[in-house]
């Protein structure tokens, strides 16, 4: 039976990512594995926004830090013994599979599916697709065609996202 010891879970503040995070917590507990929770701020897309809002990157950083701290608390309270968080800047498509996976010696990367439609996915591609193509280890993409009606996010709440949108 395959066991995992270093699991990387990529989160972005979406409900799909939180759904995948919940699955990652379960896998980490079953394998008594270290769980590294990662958020990559795609700084390339923010440069144009900063013309309008000079504090946009700072807001994004604070949002990511609060998100990661919330996920760490949930994982720890759920019984994951070794939890680490990482905040990076750059392209998630490259940073996650080509840099972070090697740095933490990941043997499993988990991520959720994006909220992109077919046209957007064709034009820009998806982060999960890039991870699958470039990862040096196993990858589990947690699919959700539609989240269950009773799913309530604990961390990536509407209130948290709205707090950093203004």
Swiss-Prot record:
Any Pfam family matching the protein: Usp
PANTHER family named among the record's database cross-references: STRESS RESPONSE PROTEIN NHAX, UNIVERSAL STRESS PROTEIN UP12
CDD domains in the cross-refs: USP-like
The name this protein goes by in its record: Putative universal stress protein SAOUHSC_01819
Species this chain originates from: Staphylococcus aureus (strain NCTC 8325 / PS 47)
InterPro entries the record matches: Rossmann-like_a/b/a_fold (IPR014729), Universal_stress_UspA (IPR006015), UspA (IPR006016)
Keyword vocabulary terms for this entry: Cytoplasm
GO cellular component annotations of the record: cytoplasm
Localization of this protein: Cytoplasm
Chief localization: cytoplasm
Domain of life: Bacteria
